[in-house]
Amino acid sequence: MSIDLNWETLTTGPDGIALAEKIRDFVHAKFQTVTLPRFIKGVKVHTFDFGSIAPEVELKDICDPLPDFYEDLDDDDGGSDEDDEGSNSCQTDEENEAAKTLRERRKMDRVERTANGSSNVSNPPSYTDTRYPGLRSMQASGDNGSPFLGVSTPGIPGGTSNLSYFHSQLASGFSGTQTPLAAVAGAHLPQGWPDRPSPSLHMSALRNQSHTSLSHTASERPMTPPQIADLSQQSIREKASASTLAVSSSTTGPVTRGGATEKTIPEEQTSEGEEPTSPPRRFREPKPEDLQTVFRVRYSGNIRLSLTVDILLDYPMPSFVGIPVRLNITGLSFDGVAVLAYIRKRAHFCFLSPEDAYAAIGADEKEAGGSGGMKMGALLHEIKVESEIGQRENGKQVLKNVGKVEKFVLEQVRRIFEDEFVYPSFWTFLV
């Protein structure tokens, strides 16, 4: 079902101008934390413009929210429903600092996942059962009836049971060997996926592996309990911290976290002599009125980001002088899947990674998207940049299209978008 957006109403007027300024401030702050190459002195973002072309939005599914959206991010007892309804306050400096730390840890985790081949934008992986437990073939998606892999019955896909969605993580194994939505895909089955061994046999095998030699390389050896303990310690250290945005408040960073876990982390996975550096993750109780919508978003418009880069010249001596280069980033296009969840006065928004995007909308959409020129799920298919050095006054020469600078800026824009907006990172708004 297609959704018409009044793009002019959303992006113009006082609210639209204020939102554009917040986005400019956010991108500028991100560039200040980037390690610059030797030939660049600094980057300053000047303006951000939404443009006049609206994205195409198509509703694909209505289901239960992702488990991460239920995480209780309050440090005190203010996580009750009554406090949720009356909460208007912004984050403290300590909470913002904690959120920044979590974002950095999540970025490192995303780099490791990409290095291991679990997230490939240009060549999305085929969904076979070679990865344990992994995503299965999309051919049987209608029979399985997953809220993300298609349904065979009318009505609301995925049903109204939040608990089946939430409790599925206990039977989904450890998230290091599967995509975030793979566990969700098998949540409705009593024993998980049909070809999945029983959890008791799996845990027994893991215990036996702990007594074997660890001489294999990291890419070949199985997942042994010491490695699982390391993952659990990392998950414990990643203390949840919400980033919220009221209608009239300032924007904060997105929430970033590890894979979905149960309400507490088993104590047997931690070392006896080591205490966790932060309390275990807490989750709110799901309610029947909680709702999540899955959208396919296509965009090829004229969003514009203007910034200045100072280039250092090494003649006649190193870093002799800096020359400002004006860059205009435009022509952005992407085709991806977005998730918007509404839970107790909070709206959670994020995009899905390519492998999760294919799982969310099914095999038919995958084939249809591939024939349209852009690969669905591969966010930011194209970004164009225009660069100029010098002035056009009085017949002076102008140097255009500085290759290295353009490449660096485009890489950073793509990295910021994927790190901050792609699940498991997500944004939370107070509504």
UniProtKB/Swiss-Prot annotation:
Compositionally biased intervals (Basic and acidic residues): 97-113
Compartments it resides in: Mitochondrion outer membrane; Endoplasmic reticulum membrane
PROSITE patterns: SMP
InterPro entries with a match to the protein in the record: Mdm12, MMM1_dom, SMP_LBD
Ranges for region Disordered: 68-153, 209-289
Composition skew (Polar residues), residue ranges: 115-129
Acidic residues bias spans: 69-96
Record keywords: Endoplasmic reticulum, Lipid transport, Lipid-binding, Membrane, Mitochondrion, Mitochondrion outer membrane, Transport
Domain SMP-LTD: 1-431
Pfam families: MMM1
GO biological-process terms attached to the record: mitochondrial genome maintenance; mitochondrion-endoplasmic reticulum membrane tethering; phospholipid transport; protein insertion into mitochondrial outer membrane
Chief location of this protein within or outside the cell: mitochondrion
Gene Ontology CC terms: endoplasmic reticulum membrane; ERMES complex
The UniProt record lists the keyword Heme: no
Domain comment as written in the entry: The SMP-LTD domain is a barrel-like domain that can bind various types of glycerophospholipids in its interior and mediate their transfer between two adjacent bilayers.
Family the UniProt entry places it in: Belongs to the MDM12 family.
Biological function: Component of the ERMES/MDM complex, which serves as a molecular tether to connect the endoplasmic reticulum (ER) and mitochondria. Components of this complex are involved in the control of mitochondrial shape and protein biogenesis, and function in nonvesicular lipid trafficking between the ER and mitochondria. Mdm12 is required for the interaction of the ER-resident membrane protein mmm1 and the outer mitochondrial membrane-resident beta-barrel protein mdm10.
Annotated protein name in UniProt: Mitochondrial distribution and morphology protein 12
Source organism (scientific name): Sclerotinia sclerotiorum (strain ATCC 18683 / 1980 / Ss-1)
Native organism taxonomy: Eukaryota, Fungi, Dikarya, Ascomycota, Pezizomycotina
Gene: mdm12
